[in-house]
C-alpha cells in the first residue's frame, strides 16, 4: 500500500461508519495518517495514540514519538491522548510517562487488556506466546522482565492514573477477581 491507497481506505471506512449511523469513534492509532479524513468527517473522533516500548531503555524515545503524533492531531484541533498499547508492550518507565501526561492533560486513557492466554502466562510465569514473540520474533532483550505472578490488569493498574477515565479493549481473559 502506498500513502494514497491508505488515505482512500481510511476515507472509505469513515464514510461507511457514517452511513451505518456511527457518529462518535474512539480510534486507536499509532500514526497521523487519518488526520485529513478526520478533519473532513461528520464523525466526532477521539484518537488514542498508542505508545509501545517493552524495554525500559526505549521509554523516552517511545513516549516522544507518541507525543509527536499527538501534537499533529492537537495542531489541527482534533481530540487525542497518548495511551499505553497493552500491559505486555509498555515498560514501567513508559507507563509512568504516559500516566504523568494523562494527569497533566486530564485525558482519556485506553489500553488493550487481557486479550490472550499468552498475556496471562507472560505476567504469571514469564512464559507463553507473548514471551516468545517479544524475545524471538522481535529480538527484544527480556532479561529485565520479572513476572508478577498476577494478571496483567492487576499488575499494571498501579501505573494508570486513578482519576482519568479508562477504556479497556478486549478483556477476553478478564476474570471476576480482576474486576473485584
Place the predicted regions along the sequence by residue:
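Active-site mouth loops of central-metabolism enzymes
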Residues: 1-8, 54-59, 81, 86
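Metal-associated gating/positioning segment near the N- to mid-region
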Residues: 1-31
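Histidine/acidic residue-rich metal-binding segments in metalloenzymes
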Residues: 11, 33-41, 63-180
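Alpha-helix capping at helix-to-loop junctions
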Residues: 16-23, 43-44, 54-57, 72-75
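Glycine-rich, histidine-containing beta strand-loop boundary motifs that form or position
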Residues: 29-30, 49, 113
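Acidic, His- and aromatic-enriched active-site or binding-groove loops in soluble protein domains
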Residues: 44-56, 108-110, 134
